[in-house]
Amino acid sequence: MGDMYDESFDKSGGPADLMDDSWVESVSWKDLLKKLHSIKFALQSGRDEITGLLAALNRQCPYSPYEQFPDKKVYFLLDSRANSALGVIQNASAFKRRADEKNAVAGVTNIPANPNTTVTTNQGSTTTTKANTGSTLEEDLYTYYKFDDASTAFHKSLTSLENMELKSYYRRNFEKVFGIKFGGAAASSSAPPPASGGPIRPNP
């Protein structure tokens, strides 16, 4: 049998119970927060970038009963607060203008918008024609408030993540905190002792 962690690995509240949780390598986590902070949320391209960044984030557990915790790397264990904030950011990034969605469904893209035009009459009064945005005033107002909600949720959740203190682990403190040992000797410690033919008496 190859190397593995000892029986303490499986105790209640131990490493085995955390294998389904989200683990993120510290450098990748800090890089993600830095990139999210620099994104222009008001632009659709920026919101699309958020989706890509979150999809690319590796949250897999870095160890198993047969794989020792990585050496020379620090990992953050994402708790419910962090996962919730990431979920809010993911949902906020999915915001799209209703007019854009309708155009996309109709197979229409890049419709040139007519600019606002102002006409002066002979009497000196002015009339303004609203630009063609493909949406009604009601839809524009709905979009504005929904976008404002999405933008606020994104920035609040990002600030929360930046200020959050997450549990961090590296190999030595991981194995010390959980009281586990890795190796062939640890794996064989639970094996039954070899059969004995009886007590051994010293020679007279």
From Swiss-Prot:
It is found in: Virion. GO terms for cellular component: helical viral capsid. Residues 112-132, 185-204 are annotated as: Disordered. Residues 191-204 have a biased composition (Pro residues). The keyword Oxidoreductase does not apply. Pfam families: TMV_coat. GO terms for molecular function: structural molecule activity. SUPFAM superfamilies: TMV-like viral coat proteins. Residues 117-132 have a biased composition (Low complexity). Keywords: Capsid protein, Helical capsid protein, Virion. Coiled coil: none annotated. Capsid protein self-assembles to form rod-shaped virions about 22 nm in diameter with a central canal enclosing the viral genomic RNA. Interacts with the 40 kDa protein; this interaction may play a role in vector transmission of the virus. Belongs to the virgaviridae capsid protein family. This is Capsid protein. The gene is CP.
